[in-house]
Amino acid sequence: MKGRSDGGQKKRVIALVCVAAVVLVFVYLFYGSSDHRASAIEYGRKLGLGGDDDDTKQDDTSSSFGVDDGFTPRSFPVCDDRHSELIPCLDRNLIYQMRLKLDLSLMEHYERHCPPPERRFNCLIPPPNGYKVPIKWPKSRDEVWKVNIPHTHLAHEKSDQNWMVVKGDKINFPGGGTHFHYGADKYIASMANMLNYPNNVLNNGGRLRTVFDVGCGVASFGGYLLSSDILTMSLAPNDVHQNQIQFALERGIPASLGVLGTKRLPYPSRSFELSHCSRCRIDWLQRDGILLLELDRVLRPGGYFAYSSPEAYAQDEEDLRIWREMSALVERMCWKIAAKRNQTVIWQKPLTNDCYLEREPGTQPPLCRSDNDPDAVWGVNMEACITSYSDHDHKTKGSGLAPWPARLTSPPPRLADFGYSTGMFEKDTELWRQRVDTYWDLLSPRIESDTVRNIMDMKASMGSFAAALKEKDVWVMNVVPEDGPNTLKLIYDRGLMGAVHSWCEAFSTYPRTYDLLHAWDIISDIKKKGCSEVDLLLEMDRILRPSGFIIIRDKQRVVDFVKKYLKALHWEEVGTKTDSDSDQDSDNVVFIVQKKLWLTSESLRDME
């Protein structure tokens, strides 16, 4: 018995040793002696892409904002392929891991929840297997590479609505939508006809320029408005129709991730001439109409809300109830029906405060308190109240904006809110026109007329950088930092668009969104705020497309700092120029880099 027992113990020990050995082998194969994720990178050189200076030694004397630590990072680890579409502040896995107590009925799970520093992915986001340089605009409006967004769920789910169709190695967009199966162009012309606009053109001679499309699908509505010189902020959450915004951005159509939940939208008051909801599945009656009141906040005086939904036409009991209650709500908000036809109703917001002042005492929703700043949006909760106009706006009876394109260069009426003069505005516009000319001179050896489509200005001020790009076939997401002057309303008054954001956090967009980032003093600013400049560089890399460009306009010490990370980030220098065009930025340097197209070794094996 003793010998038999000893033999059994020996067998168990041998089995445990074998299991441990197998585990160790797997650990070694996965991580490797030099970190699997970091060493797996193969440069574009192997694919005949990108630059040829990967082995160039970095300058170890570069200082980190004036502190020479002698450290030059050789590489960043590469994130797991599962994170190729990571949006750090809209990460459902993070919500689960942190056990956040969120109210799903209020859409809090679709709002921003950013990881604390110890949970950030300090790694490079890999492109999907077989990634290709995106199709160029304007062809991209109608087709994209399937391999770049390998999700065909929507094509099957919405096959009867013409959202998108898979054809070989591409995904085509016929221009349909849930409400406009036969094309957005016909639907748009019908709306213009309802409003009696000349020639059924919705821009109304340039008077209607900025549009907000909530629950936008793949943004075909906004895409087809571009030909009418109408700029649309297409918004949708990363919900069950996941990747709809990613498709929009891959197409070269302005779009952003977001939701009408509990926080204000990151746009100032009086930003849009038209808001649009086509079968957007939003309960507008919830919480005393708070979501409809948020739309009211961002609409200009006399602005429209176009609503295409069964509630506007269906005759069943439930839809009729919703229609009655919604009609009563907007009437108390002083909206009037501008037009109603078939399945669409278009309401109009009042031009002045007259109707608000004539309401019976105690009428709900109430007017917002006088200390409620309608332009404070970053992390600010929505309120179920009506944003009335200032005395100046009430007397003006409208926005006072010039029609597009004169609007772009006309001094915005809200300049006075910042104490800016017309002369300052005109000088700023001319200064950035000259700067953009310089940028394109530096970029010209690397770009063609269609190389760049999606652009972000990371610190947009009055929007003059974007204004200088008017003659180019591009669109610009103008970002205004949350802790500076809220000049975003000037940007919207110029017929441009953008969002308020803190660069201490990740932006609400997918990886590989932008062809060009403009970073004016933003790296210096982030350092002053005590946030990580390395995290910012990784975020810039995340949202930049492979082969995309970054224009850094900052202090020489900042440029020296960035140069230390070029090799690790797989960026290469395109050009440098000392800034000598203004006293304000006399010590600034223009430094342009290009992101290389690289693939992981797993991707290369799949290609072989």
Swiss-Prot record:
Its EC number is 2.1.1.-. InterPro entries: Put_SAM_MeTrfase (IPR004159), SAM-dependent_MTases_sf (IPR029063). Residues 1-12 are cytoplasmic. It comes from Arabidopsis thaliana (Mouse-ear cress). The keyword Mitochondrion does not apply. Belongs to the methyltransferase superfamily. This is Probable methyltransferase PMT3. Residues 34-608 are lumenal.
